[in-house]
Amino acid sequence: MGVTIVLGSQWGDEGKGKITDMLAQQATLCCRAAGGHNAGHTIVHGDKTYDFHILPSGLVSPSCVNLIGAGTVVHVPSFFKELASLEDKGLEGAGKRIFISDRAHVCFDLHSVVDGLEEAKLGGRKVGTTGKGIGPCYSDKAARRGVRVGEILDEALFERKLRSLDAGYRARFGELEYNVEEELARFKEYRKRLGPYIVDQLAFLQKYKDAPNTLVEGANALMLDLDHGTYPFVTSSSTGLGGAVQALSLNPTSISSIIGVVKAYTTRVGSGPFPSEQLNDAGDKLQGVGKEFGVTTGRRRRCGWFDMVLCRYSQAINHYTALNLTKLDVLDDFDEIKVGVAYILPDGTRTENTMPADPEVLEKVQVEYVTLPGWKSNTMGVKKYEDLPANARAYIEYIERGLGGVPVKWIGTGPARDHMICRE
């Protein structure tokens, strides 16, 4: 098995879907390792646009089998709704190429209700979650009271565990806008439909151990990782390389490439420190030109310049063998483009490659910038590296040097599927 892993390098929304879609054309198997329907990315295929949340984007390739792995949390209504939407848009037979690990956990509507209550309690220090219930679901998993997908098939066990969850949250919060009887009734119907999708993950993966191309699709991004991200302003799963290996029982020696997807500038959704954020005309321009609204929530993304410190930190943890730089065309009309190359910490210390663990310290860092000349010409749809303006190439090569020579192998130059430069 030759494994390619695609990971987000910043705070998500880097555009992982397009490179995953491209690589899936040659893949036998595409796997999601972590996260749930809080993730979101868009693939433009011909005249159709597909929005993905919990389903692997390998479904766009008619020859690719897809797995939702053990590290994920699955909101069953969203699974069926998303699958139906894809099939309605012409992806016939998608339902025959998607499987769910029996060890993945179930994200209930109950978790979404609890998510909102927990955020409200935090007041001004709220995390800024998607409100999808992901955090409470992973909390139940860690506390060993969660419900696994495979347990849906055992009606008595499933009912006992869901009632226990409901009772526990009512003891904590009082009355909830949630009806456990209605949920149990819904799952009577889901139980009949889910059976063909649920698999023993290890046995399933063993069937593909000799597959030449297996693709692992990361969700969210390294800076949202539970351990390595800007905690507590993170998601509740392991979104980096380690999480992919753990969730899918990967043999590390089978990994042939680790692709870091990095936007040509930086964005973030929700609360938390963002050193290179631009609360000015430059930030507004990045937001407007880049159409920076979340696929899952529709929220306006915060925007800032490319942060080399953040990306060096991300590289040190995820060990990228190549990069996909996305949305280069968004920078086309800037006279000057800034790159954050160092942080000055509150105590005066200068750092180029580490992120303070304390979010309050990170919020107070001063960013040292290098200013590069813009190219002031249209790059949308450019497909050959040599056809890019000289200053655009200089920008890309500056990023490569700043990240220790990790090659920028792919460059996104627009939203369409073929708006991609591949540098061999």
Swiss-Prot record:
Residues reported to bind GTP: 12-18, 40-42, 301, 327-329, 412-414
Residues reported in the UniProt entry to bind IMP: 13-16, 38-41, 130, 144, 220, 235, 299
Active site: 13 (proton acceptor), 41 (proton donor)
Superkingdom field: Eukaryota
Cofactor: Mg(2+)
EC number: 6.3.4.4
Lineage: Eukaryota, Fungi, Dikarya, Ascomycota, Pezizomycotina
SUPFAM superfamilies for the chain: P-loop containing nucleoside triphosphate hydrolases (SSF52540)
Cofactor note (record): Binds 1 Mg(2+) ion per subunit.
Binding site for Mg(2+): 13, 40
Protein name: Adenylosuccinate synthetase
Pathway where this protein functions: Purine metabolism; AMP biosynthesis via de novo pathway; AMP from IMP: step 1/2
A biological-process GO annotation: IMP metabolic process
Pfam families on file: Adenylsucc_synt
